UniProtKB/Swiss-Prot annotation:
Record function comment: Catalyzes the epimerization of the S- and R-forms of NAD(P)HX, a damaged form of NAD(P)H that is a result of enzymatic or heat-dependent hydration. This is a prerequisite for the S-specific NAD(P)H-hydrate dehydratase to allow the repair of both epimers of NAD(P)HX.
Cofactor(s), by name: K(+)
Full protein name: NAD(P)H-hydrate epimerase
Annotated (6S)-NADPHX binding sites: 82-86, 154-160, 165, 183
Gene: nnrE
Source species: Rhodopirellula baltica (strain DSM 10527 / NCIMB 13988 / SH1)
Amino acid sequence: MSPEVLSARPGFVRNLMDVMMKPVLQLPPMTCQRIREIDSLAMEQFQMPGIILMENAGRGAAELIEELAPEGNVLILCGKGNNGGDGFTIARHLQLAGREVMILAMAATNELQGDAAIQAKIAEAAGIKIQVVGEAVEAGRLPATDIVVDGLLGTGAKPPLRGRYAEVVEAANASSAIRIALDIPTGMNGDTGETGETTFRADHTLTFAAPKVGFEKLGAARFTGEVHVISIGVPLELLRQFSV
C-alpha cells in the first residue's frame, strides 16, 4: 500500500465518523435542569453509567477541538466536578491524536470524587502533565499555550466567580490563546445568560446534549463565541422524549 493511501486514510475515517456519529434528532435550547433530567434518565432508565456519558462528551469535544484548532499545544483548566472530568477526558483523547497537552487543575487528583476522579487518574496514568493551580496564576498568567480549554465550572455554578476560580478565569482571558469553553463559559448562568464581573470569554463553546437557553439572551454571545452542540450518546428514544 502506498504512503499516499496510508496518509489519506486517517482523515477519511475521521470524516466518516463525523457523519455517522451526528444524532438524527437535535434538541432545542434547554434549561440546565432539563439537561440534568436527561443525564438522570440516561443513567436510571437506560442503564448508562455516568462515566460513559462523560467519555462520550469528552471524546466528541476532543474531536471538535481537533477541527477548530488543529495546530498548537493545549492547556485544559479542570475544576473539581464533572466539568473538570470532561476536561481530563478530552486531554487523553487529544494526547492520542498527537497533541501536546497540559492540565491545570483546581485540586489534586486524590481530592476528586466520582467520575471526575476516575478520568483524572486515567489521564495521570497516561502520562499527561497535571499541575495544580499555583504561583503561575497568582502572578496573573497561565503557562504558555496556543489553546486554553475551560473545564472549570459547569451548569450548576452561578455568578459571580470568587477566589481562585476568578483568578484563573482572569488569567485565561488575558491570554492570547484560542479560548474554548466546555458546556458553558465559567461565570455564566446557563438559564439567564447572566454573567458576573469575571466570566470566561470563549471563542467557541462546546455545549453538551443541547444549547442552553441562556445562550440566546442579549449579550451572552460575547462570552460564548460560536456555540457547537456535542452529543453525549444518549439513546434516540430519550432524545425523542425531550424534543417536544
